[in-house]
Curated annotation (Swiss-Prot):
Organism: Methanocaldococcus jannaschii (strain ATCC 43067 / DSM 2661 / JAL-1 / JCM 10045 / NBRC 100440) (Methanococcus jannaschii)
GO molecular function, one term: zinc ion binding
SUPFAM superfamilies reported for this sequence: ARM repeat
Pfam families: DZR
The name this protein goes by in its record: Double zinc ribbon protein MJ0416
Keywords: Metal-binding, Zinc, Zinc-finger
InterPro entries: ARM-type_fold, Double_zinc_ribbon, DZR
Transmembrane spans: none
């Protein structure tokens, strides 16, 4: 039997504040510490998932923010590595669903009409996980689709595109001339 040693409140606060820090060295040390915890004590991450989802979600959100917005490439890479190790510690929770043909068990794409391996019709198949169907044509659809690949029906309203600074990749307003985060000139004065 494995004895679970959960993260102390001090450790949790240290990780969250370290990931929020504006000092790159502090972020890097925190990322490495989190990697070590995920590798050496994965049960501590699982414990967080079970008993302190708020902190775990905050850690994952902060890692994603570093990956998306941090101007330092080394920190972005370390955050990606850390996130993968945390996901690995959490196990199958983050694995992606790949639909398999009911007849031949080959991987299929929900955009296909027939299995490319055996010719079975995909519309009539059932899957282990619940897969949405198009309200217009009743074919299976993917969560990420904006339009149905079978009939072209609109599935989602288009999200407003967020403008980002080409230099630091942070969100900027269209009327801004200079990025307030890094000083990059966004457009010329009229």
């Amino acid at each position: 039997m494995v004895r679970v040693v959960p993260l102390t409140d001090e450790e949790k606060m240290s990780i969250v504040s370290g990931l929020r820090s504006s000092v790159p060295a502090t972020k890097l040390v925190t990322l490495r510490k989190l990697q070590e915890i995920a590798e050496v004590r994965p049960e501590a991450i699982l414990y967080l998932d079970t008993y302190d989802k708020v902190t775990l979600n905050e850690i994952i959100t902060l890692l994603n923010q570093i990956i998306e917005y941090d101007p330092d490439e080394i920190l972005r890479r370390e955050a990606m590595i850390t996130l993968e190790k945390v996901k690995k510690a959490l196990g199958t929770k983050f694995s992606t669903f790949v639909p398999l043909c009911n007849s031949c068990k080959s991987p299929i794409d929900l955009g296909w009409t027939y299995c490319t391996n055996c010719g079975a019709e995909i519309k009539n198949m059932t899957f282990e996980e619940e897969v949405e169907r198009c309200p217009n044509c009743n074919n299976y659809i993917s969560d990420s689709w904006k339009y149905c690949a079978h009939c072209g029906a609109k599935l989602k309203e288009e999200e407003e595109e967020v403008l980002r600074c080409p230099n630091c990749k942070r969100p900027v307003q269209p009327e801004w001339i200079v990025c307030p985060y890094c000083g990059y000139r966004l457009k010329r004065k009229p």
